[in-house]
Amino acid sequence: MTTMFLNLLLAFTVALVGVFIYREHLMSTLLCLEGMMLSIFIMVALILLHHHLNSTMMLPLILLVFSACEAGVGLALLVKTSNSYGTDHINNLNLLQC
């Protein structure tokens, strides 16, 4: 069980490093954030199953819903910036203010 958690922690760390490395491009950042959320989802689900905490089994589903909302908002920002400026650089997000 510990090697599985170690692999999930490594996947989270690699995705976090990816956010720091590819922070200029919105699409790469969104993919890394999605990887982070999925590794957190799997870790929480495994911890709850391992400890037989049946009263909190809804927590991973709530986390997955928030992850889907985050992905939807991120893709909407990606479409808006790519239609307006033709690129997915994050520094263009400051230009979207009213």
Curated annotation (Swiss-Prot):
PANTHER family to which the protein is assigned, alphabetical: NADH-UBIQUINONE OXIDOREDUCTASE CHAIN 4L, NADH-UBIQUINONE OXIDOREDUCTASE SUBUNIT ND4L
Lineage of source species: Eukaryota, Metazoa, Chordata, Craniata, Vertebrata
Gene: MT-ND4L
Family recorded in the similarity comment: Belongs to the complex I subunit 4L family.
Cell location: Mitochondrion inner membrane
Catalysed conversion reaction: a ubiquinone + NADH + 5 H(+)(in) = a ubiquinol + NAD(+) + 4 H(+)(out)
Cellular compartments per GO CC: mitochondrial inner membrane; respiratory chain complex I
Self-association state and partner proteins as the record states: Core subunit of respiratory chain NADH dehydrogenase (Complex I) which is composed of 45 different subunits.
A GO term for molecular function: NADH dehydrogenase (ubiquinone) activity
Transmembrane annotation, as ranges: 1-21, 29-49, 59-79
Name of protein: NADH-ubiquinone oxidoreductase chain 4L
Coiled coil: none
